[in-house]
């Protein structure tokens, strides 16, 4: 059954390519970008995305390809970069990628209150949409996005139906299969009629993708960790440019250069005390070096060796939460906790445990590769074994809450080698749907003193929960305060209006009696 399906799909892809070349490219070669035509002949997934969106009807798919390719050349999609977009548009933060919904789809934010309808800038705004979508499509081929229409504090000047229609067309024609859903937050009543029109543009099948939400419902689709405070979330993210804010996971620093002696002295507590609930500093003689790099051609001077022995290394704080994935258990589950510069405990630990019967290859990527050293960042883990990964900020660079880490893992065949060359080849060939991914956020603990603090699981979780609750309550309090201020302003306005009407009425009555008795 699956084999027949694959054969039918291959036939449809082949027919689509052949007919598009014969019926469209010959007559309209100057209307298309040659790079798009070439990609159509090579990228099966791209062709399949158009076919799937048109229910495998080749005639409809060809029309869609024609419209899409003409638009791509008209707006120069393949050549779009940051310099193609006016800097003020990138700085204002009306459109950007940040965070994930509960299904793991990237969030495509559209902050409508920052948009002003203006025909002079509409082309630049369309290019901005295309820039972000093309940038995402090249990195995450086939992964859908969730569009977040944030309509809070939106005025009449921000309503631009042509711009909304363009966004809808992007997902209907230009980037098929990339739309997971459209979450519309805090829609003003005056836009009800407008979004009835939007439903007709989407078509009957895509209407179900529209999700109208308020502060209570939006958390059904996006966790509070990726929602801003005005949506009832706890995400501290503040948009700024430069740089671009999307999660661009890259190779960390340690794979691009030599590992210094400072990193080689990294060590961890080797024996867990039974019955003890405190983390203590232990001497270097009781610790074993972690992930020491072995190079027979590289000699270490006696002075450097003495420095290693004399240096005092603090014990790592043991991660207390675990993400249980199908290939690896990853600890911590969600956040990497770094100590402050003052505390001197800037390093943190990621523990990977292989829960399969085969070797699992893993890679670690980060959105800030120039800031972190990761050891090891590309290796493998034997069945049932655990690997400790040391993450440390490079030099004096500070940890940011916007930084992210991505753990990628895939199961290897038993006959596969685990050397650097074999791992490189393995990652080139492994299908994307076989790769497990897990993301970790960064958090700085300003006054962390794990040598003297008692770290009980329950107390630790309680403090995390309490902190999150306080942050959530504070954001709700600020939102209530803002609404109260708005109500006070409206009351003052009505009071002034009433006073003016009273004065006007008094003047009218006075004039009436004056004329009556004079």
From Swiss-Prot:
PROSITE patterns: CRAL_TRIO, MSP. It is a single-pass type IV membrane protein. Residues 327-445 form the MSP domain. The chain crosses the membrane at residues 497-518. Residues 265-279 have a biased composition (Basic and acidic residues). The keyword Transferase does not apply. The record marks 363 as: Required for phosphorylated FFAT motif binding. Highly expressed in CD14(+) monocytes, and at lower levels in neutrophils. Does not show significant expression in B-cells or T-cells. The keyword Endoplasmic reticulum applies. It is found in: Endoplasmic reticulum membrane. GO terms for biological process: chemotaxis; lipid droplet formation; positive regulation of monocyte chemotaxis; positive regulation of neutrophil chemotaxis; protein homooligomerization. Residues 82-239 form the CRAL-TRIO domain. It comes from the Eukaryota. SUPFAM superfamilies: CRAL/TRIO domain, CRAL/TRIO N-terminal domain, PapD-like. One of its GO terms (molecular function) is FFAT motif binding. Residues 252-308 are annotated as: Disordered. Residues 1-496 are cytoplasmic. Its main location: endoplasmic reticulum. The record marks 374 as: Required for FFAT motif binding. Keywords: Chemotaxis, Endoplasmic reticulum, Membrane, Transmembrane, Transmembrane helix. Homooligomer. Interacts (via MSP domain) with STARD3NL (via FFAT motif), RMDN3 (via FFAT motif), OSBPL1A (via FFAT motif) and CERT1 (via FFAT motif). Interacts (via MSP domain) with STARD3 (via phosphorylated FFAT motif); this interaction depends on the critical phosphorylation of STARD3 on 'Ser-209'. Interacts with RB1CC1 (via phosphorylated FFAT motif), MIGA2 (via phosphorylated FFAT motif) and OSBPL1A (via FFAT motif). The MSP domain is required for binding to the FFAT motif of target proteins. The CRAL-TRIO domain is necessary for the recruitment to lipid droplets (LDs) and mediates the formation of ER-LDs contacts through an amphipathic helix. Endoplasmic reticulum-anchored protein that mediates the formation of contact sites between the endoplasmic (ER) and endosomes, mitochondria or Golgi through interaction with conventional- and phosphorylated-FFAT-containing organelle-bound proteins. In addition, forms endoplasmic reticulum (ER)-lipid droplets (LDs) contacts through a direct protein-membrane interaction and participates in LDs homeostasis. The attachment mechanism involves an amphipathic helix that has an affinity for lipid packing defects present at the surface of LDs. This is Motile sperm domain-containing protein 2. It comes from Homo sapiens. The gene is MOSPD2.
């Amino acid at each position: 059954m699956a084999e027949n399906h694959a054969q039918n799909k291959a036939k449809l892809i082949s027919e689509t390519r052949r007919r598009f070349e014969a019926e469209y490219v010959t007559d309209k070669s100057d209307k298309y970008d040659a790079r798009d035509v070439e990609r159509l002949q090579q990228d099966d997934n791209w062709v399949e995305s158009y076919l799937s969106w048109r229910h495998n009807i080749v005639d409809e798919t060809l029309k869609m390809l024609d419209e899409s390719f003409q638009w791509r050349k008209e707006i120069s999609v393949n050549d779009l970069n940051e310099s193609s977009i006016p800097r003020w548009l990138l700085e204002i933060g009306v459109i950007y990628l940040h965070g994930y919904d509960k299904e793991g789809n990237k969030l495509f934010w559209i902050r409508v209150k920052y948009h002003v309808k203006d025909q002079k800038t509409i082309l630049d705004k369309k290019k901005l949409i295309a820039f972000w979508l093309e940038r995402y499509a090249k990195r995450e081929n086939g992964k859908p996005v969730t569009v977040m229409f944030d309509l809070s504090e939106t005025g009449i000047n921000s309503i631009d139906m042509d711009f909304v229609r363009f966004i809808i067309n992007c997902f209907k024609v230009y980037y098929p299969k990339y739309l997971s859903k459209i979450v519309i937050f805090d829609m003003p009543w005056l836009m009800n009629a407008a979004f009835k029109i939007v439903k007709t543009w989407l078509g009957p099948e895509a209407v179900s993708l529209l999700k109208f939400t308020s502060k209570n419902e939006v958390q059904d689709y996006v966790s509070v960790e990726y929602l801003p405070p005005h949506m009832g979330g706890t995400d501290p993210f503040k948009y700024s440019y430069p740089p671009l804010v999307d999660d661009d996971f890259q190779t960390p620093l340690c794979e691009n250069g030599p590992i210094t002696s400072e990193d080689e002295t990294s060590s961890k507590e080797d024996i867990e005390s039974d019955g003890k609930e405190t983390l203590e500093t232990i001497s270097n003689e009781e610790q074993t070096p972690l992930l020491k790099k072995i190079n027979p051609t590289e000699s270490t001077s006696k002075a450097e060796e003495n420095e290693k022995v004399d240096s005092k290394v603090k014990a790592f704080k043991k991660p207390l939460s675990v993400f249980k994935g199908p290939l690896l258990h990853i600890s911590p589950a969600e956040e990497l906790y770094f100590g402050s510069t003052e505390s001197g405990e800037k390093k943190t630990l990621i523990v990977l445990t292989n829960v399969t019967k085969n070797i699992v290859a893993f890679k670690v990527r980060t959105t800030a590769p120039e800031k972190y050293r990761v050891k090891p960042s590309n290796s493998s883990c034997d069945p049932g074994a655990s690997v400790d990964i040391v993450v440390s900020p490079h030099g004096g660079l500070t940890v940011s809450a916007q930084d992210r880490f991505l753990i990628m893992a895939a199961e290897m065949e038993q006959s596969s080698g685990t050397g650097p060359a074999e791992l490189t080849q393995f990652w080139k060939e492994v299908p994307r749907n076989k790769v497990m991914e897990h993301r970790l956020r960064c958090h700085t603990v300003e006054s962390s003193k794990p040598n003297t603090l008692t770290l009980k699981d329950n107390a630790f979780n309680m403090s995390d929960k309490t902190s999150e609750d306080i942050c959530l309550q504070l954001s709700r309090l600020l939102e209530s305060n803002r609404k109260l201020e708005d109500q006070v302003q409206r009351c003052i306005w009505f009071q002034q209006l009433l006073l003016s009407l009273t004065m006007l009425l008094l003047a009218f009555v006075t004039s009436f009696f004056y004329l009556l008795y004079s």
